[in-house]
Amino acid sequence: MNHATSELHDESAVTSIPETTRLQDLKALVKMGIVNSNTLTVFTGFWLALHFNGLSVLDNLDKLFFTIVGSGLVMAGVCCLNNYIDRDIDPLMERTKTRPTVTGKYKPGFALTFGLVILLLGFVFLLLTTPMAVLMGFIGAFTYVVLYSLWTKRKYTLNTVVGSISGAVPPLIGWAAIDPSLGHPIAWMLFLIMFIWQIPHFLALAMKRVDEYRNAGIPMLPVVHGFEITKRQIMIWTVCLLPLPFYMSGLGITFMVIATLLNIGWIVLGFYGFRKKDDIKWSVQMFVYSLNYLTILFVSMIVVTFF
C-alpha cells in the first residue's frame, strides 16, 4: 500500500473516531478480550498441574499471582506489538479501524515501547515461578510477533496454523509454573486442544470477514481458495479434536463425556454448513459455538477435579 493510499485511509478513519475513555483505549491497545480468554487457559494449566502433582493452591498462591500477572503482561505486550505492526492495514478493516493505533489515540512509538516494556516485565514475573514458564512465554511471544505478525500473516494462507502455535502456549505456561518438566501427557493435550481449536475458530471468522481481509490484502484461506475449501478445512480440524478427550482419562469419565458431546455438537454443526446456502450465517454460528466450546471445556476441566 503506497503512502497516498495510507493517508486517505488515515483521514477517513479520523473523521469517524469514536468517543472513548483512556481506559477503553488502553484495553483496546492490549486487546484485553484476548488476554482475558487466554488467562482462563493459563489458569487451567496451572490448576491441573497442581492437581496431578498433589499440590495445594493455598500453598502456591504466590506462584499463582506471578503466573497470572506475568502471562497477562506477556500476552498484552505481544498484542501491543501486533497493533504496532498492523497499523498500516488496520484502517482497511471494519473490526480494526477503531483501534487506538489507527485513530491516533496512541502513537506508534508509544505502542512499540509500551509493548516491549510490559512484555519484558511479564518475563520477569514468570521468572519468579520457573525458567520453563519464561521459555514457554518466549516461544509464544516469538511465534506471535515474528513468525505470525511479521512473516506469515501477509504472505501465506498457513498464517492461521502458525498463529495457532502461539495461542496454544498459554496452558503450558501455567503448567510449567508448577511442573517445569511438562512431563504429564495432559499438559500436551491442553496444547493440542488449543492449537487445533484455533484453526476452525479463526477460519470461521475469516469467512465472516472475508471482504475485509481481501481489502487489506491478507491471504486468509477463504480469500485465496474460497468458501468450499475453507469449510472442508474447518471440518478436518474440528474432527481432529474428537479423539483428544480419550487421552485425558485422568480427568474422569464425566469430563470425557462432556468433551465428546461438545466435539460431536461442533462436528454436526460443521456438516450442516455443506447443506446451508448462507455461508456467512453458518460461519457466525461456528464462530459462536467455538467460543462457548472453549469456555465450557476448560471450566469443566477445573470443575471435575473437585469430585
From Swiss-Prot:
It catalyses: heme b + (2E,6E)-farnesyl diphosphate + H2O = Fe(II)-heme o + diphosphate. GO terms for cellular component: plasma membrane. Keywords: Cell membrane, Heme biosynthesis, Membrane, Transferase, Transmembrane, Transmembrane helix. Its main location: membrane. PANTHER family: PROTOHEME IX FARNESYLTRANSFERASE, MITOCHONDRIAL. Belongs to the UbiA prenyltransferase family. Protoheme IX farnesyltransferase subfamily. Converts heme B (protoheme IX) to heme O by substitution of the vinyl group on carbon 2 of heme B porphyrin ring with a hydroxyethyl farnesyl side group. This is Protoheme IX farnesyltransferase. It comes from Bacillus thuringiensis (strain Al Hakam). The lineage of its organism: Bacteria, Bacillati, Bacillota, Bacilli, Bacillales.
